[in-house]
């Protein structure tokens, strides 16, 4: 069985096929943001397997700033098929991956085992892996609509603000391991995606904030130490969820 590359002109038409949650959430979400123009600077390629009735999908997000992302999802429970899918799809963009210093794969552990096997088989230069187990959470449309109707209250003396590229430096100061290229990455995300902050009115300082990662997931939440235990983090996260859903 062969893999195939989705032509860019077909990205819009393939979206309904990918709207299977949570199985294809990362692939669908990334492509949807790209099609709508609500994503940081990048190029995206999408692959499927097999050609007849595809059940295995990969989105390769080549970021202008920062490492590329490989997002993998499947609607099949047949783990015996995973290896065939990986070994059919990855050669279609393996040369691009080889040219990168690093890349991030988002997928199930059962699939990642075959990704690791492929990379070893194809002799990737200086290849090593670092697994970071995560749990993914999402809300269905009914719960999103409910959230839109939920009032979000801040303590006295605080107010919501929208963040943009001009706030990148403040956000970067909370990232102790940031590299020199991360500033451009953060600015690109703030320019294209919703981002929320809470400001302390008296001092004008940003007290808490959250913005989206390169795939549109909310994952960068921070409250400055002097403003913690006031409920600002929960308020920021709810407001960002509202903004993401509206956009």
Give residue spans per PLM region.
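Conserved acetyl-CoA-binding loop-helix of GNAT-fold acetyltransferases
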Residues: 81-95, 229-246
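Acyl-donor-binding surface of acyltransferase catalytic domains
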Residues: 43, 54-156
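Ligand-binding loop in jelly-roll beta-barrel domains
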Residues: 224, 246-247
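Conserved beta-hairpin
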Residues: 35-64, 73-74, 191-208
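A conserved beta-strand-loop-helix scaffold within acyl/acetyltransferase catalytic domains
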Residues: 178-226
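Secondary-structure transition/turn motif
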Residues: 73-78, 174-175, 221, 227
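Short amphipathic alpha-helix that is part of the acyltransferase structural core
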Residues: 1-29, 142-182
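Short secondary-structure junctions
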Residues: 3-6, 35, 44, 125-130, ...
């Amino acid at each position: 069985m062969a893999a195939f590359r989705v032509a860019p002109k077909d990205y819009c038409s393939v979206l309904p096929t990918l709207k299977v949650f949570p199985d294809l959430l990362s692939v669908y979400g990334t492509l949807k943001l790209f099609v709508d123009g609500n994503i940081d600077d990048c190029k995206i390629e999408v692959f499927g397997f097999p050609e007849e009735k595809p059940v295995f999908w990969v989105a390769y997000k080549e970021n202008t700033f920062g490492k590329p992302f490989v997002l993998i999802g499947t609607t099949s429970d047949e783990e015996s098929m995973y290896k065939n899918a990986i070994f059919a799809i990855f050669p279609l963009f393996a040369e691009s991956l080889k040219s990168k210093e690093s890349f991030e794969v988002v997928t199930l552990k059962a699939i990642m085992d075959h990704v690791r096997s492929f990379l070893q088989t194809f002799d990737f230069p200086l290849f090593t892996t670092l697994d970071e187990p995560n749990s993914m959470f999402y809300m269905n449309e009914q719960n999103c609509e409910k959230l839109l109707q939920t009032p979000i209250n801040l303590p006295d003396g605080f107010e919501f603000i929208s963040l943009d590229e001009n706030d990148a430096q403040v956000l970067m100061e909370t990232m102790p391991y940031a590299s020199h290229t991360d500033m451009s990455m953060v600015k690109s995300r703030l320019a294209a995606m919703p981002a929320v902050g809470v400001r302390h009115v008296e001092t004008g300082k940003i007290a808490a904030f959250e913005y989206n990662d390169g795939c549109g997931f909310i994952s960068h939440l921070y409250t400055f130490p002097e403003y913690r235990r006031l409920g600002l983090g929960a308020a920021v996260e709810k407001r960002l969820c509202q903004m993401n859903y509206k956009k």
